[in-house]
Structure formats: C-alpha cells, structure tokens
From Swiss-Prot:
SUPFAM superfamilies, per the entry: beta-beta-alpha zinc fingers
GO cellular component: cytoplasm; nucleus
PANTHER family: ZINC FINGER PROTEIN 346 (PTHR46144:SF5), ZINC FINGER PROTEIN 385B-LIKE (PTHR46144)
Keyword RNA-binding (UniProt): yes
Entry keywords, A to Z: Cytoplasm, Metal-binding, Nucleus, Repeat, RNA-binding, Zinc, Zinc-finger
Residue numbers binding Zn(2+) 2: C97, C100, H113, H119
Low complexity composition bias: residue spans: 270-289, 310-323
Region (Disordered): 263-343
Subcellular localization: Nucleus; Cytoplasm
Protein name: Zinc finger protein 346
Amino acid sequence: MADEFGDGDTVELPVGKEAVDALIRENSHIFSDTQCKVCSAVLISESQKLAHYQSRKHANKVRRYMSIHQGEEFVSAKKFKAAPAESSDGDDRSKCCPICNMTFSSPVVAESHYSGKTHIKNLRLREQGGVTEGMLHQAKKLVVTRTPTIATKIDNRMDQSDPTKFCKLCHATFNNPLMAEQHYAGKKHKKQETKTQLMTIYTSSGHTPAQAPIAINVNSPLPGSGSAGKGFSCDTCNIVLNSIEQYQAHVSGAKHKNQLMSMTPLSKEGPPAAGGPSALAGPPSTGGALSSGGPSARGFSASGGPTPKGPSSFGGLPPMGGLMPPPYPPPHSQPYVREDMMGPDGYTYFNKDF
C-alpha cells in the first residue's frame, strides 16, 4: 500500500480497496470517493473509484502535481477558496486570474499558475502601477471592437474629390497614394474609363436618325454612376452588349441600321396628281336639284352608261369608249346633257324618250 507520495519522483500504486480508502483519507483535500481534483475526474461508482485510483494515468498526474508542489504544504479546498488575496470582483481564485487574464480547469492548474514566474511578474507590475499582460489583452480587445466604427466614420468623412483617396469612376477607396496609382494603372480602371468615354461621345453627339446613319439611343451610365460596369445598352434594338467591341460592331451593322430606319417618321404626302385617285367620281348626291356637272358628275358617261373606275381613269388617260375630258374638240363641242323631269310626287327622274 502506498500511503505516502515520497519526494514526488516515484508514486506507488495502491492495491485493493483498503489501500485506496487509506489514500483518500490521508489526502482528503484532493481525493474523495466521488471526485479526484488532481485529474478533475468525477467518480460515480465504487468500481470506477477503484479503477481510477489504481491506474497509471492517475499516478503520473499525482507525481507531476507533487513535483510542482514539492516542499509545500497541501492547502485544503476550503482554505484555497477562502484566500481572497488576489481575487477580483468576486471571481473564484481557482477558476480565473484577473491579473493575468487566464482561466483554469482545476485548482491544481490554478495553484501552478499562482506559483509561476508569469503571475509573480504581473503581480509585481500591478503593485508598482505598471501595465500587466492582462491589461494589454483587454486593451487589444477594446481597440479591435472600436476599430470598425472609427473606420466607418473616416470613410463617411472622406473627401471624395481627392483622386488619391477615392475613384469616382470605379467607386474605390485607397489607403495611400501607391494603392491609388496601382488602381489607375490597372486593367479594370482603364476598361471602365474607355467605356465611359465611348458613352459620352455617343450621348453628346446630338445626332438624329435623319442626320446620321449610325445614330443611337443609348441608356448609358454617367461617369462614376452606380450603374457603371453593367454592359452597353442599345434602346433602339433593345439589347445589352458586354464589351465596347461588341457595341461598336452592333451600331455599325445592318441590323441596327435597318431598325433605325424603320423608326424614322414618314414624310407627309403632297397633293395628288391630276387624274389620280381623287379624280374618281364621288357618290351621287341625294335630295333636291342636281349639280351642273352633267351626267359625268353622277358617275355616267356621255353614252348613258356608268363611267368605268378601272386603271384607265388614272394618269390622265382617256376612259374607255374614246371619250376625252372637256373642252371637247369639234364637232363635239356640245356634249349630251340629260333632261331631268320633276314628277307630281316630288321625285326627280329623266325622260327616256328625250
């Protein structure tokens, strides 16, 4: 039975239940039937307790614990918690060290920390009014937390008129002039600049479809606008092109020109020529006296038949039957005039026997 730890270099394993119980009684401040504080283990049964205290793993941790605390008296858990010398804000001393900003998984680890050089150094600095590592760590967290807010305020107050800090064309911000120079020399900025120049030339030309063969109506983005970089739009053909080369090829192609000519408004027609469609006789009027235009005004020819309305009546050509427009040449200087008669019922008719 090993009821003594010796100098901490060698630890004998207890054998049997009696040896384990004796070990627990002699070291009750770190061992118990339900918990091993050195290993931070919870023991829920008798068999588990025996297996744990008789294991080599437990013995190695006890040996390491003894080597750290060699020559020191064991401090009970109650005394360990009751020492408020270095506690802060009510925190448990065995769980965290506010001076070094460290947390512990067990009282053994906490005691090892408090006896180490780092804690002693930070404690001395705190007593002298210096800055400890825990204070530095907290200050770093505070700086990291406040940095995005400060950066946002700086961006909001940034002078966008300074080209070394902001590119209006690409909506890009720069931290230093070297970054701005690299941006302005890059392909992305040059492509955006060429696109804006092309759009400015086309939109400021002021040409109309009747004046220029390649007049366009483009809903182009203005320099520095938010719509920059989304393609080249041709409202005439209702398409969007991806590059400047495609746009130039489109506006110089036959499809765009045909679409442009189809949108050109037609000119108003002049008065019809003599003998045109307007020379056709209109529909006969109803009611009272007839006009003095003779039978041709009613749609009848001199022979008593209807006037033809075919293609021969266009272009000043004489109608079918050899009749010519007045004045008639001799011996036909007096054309036939129909005699209209008025009946007793008020209707107009012509005499067949005339």
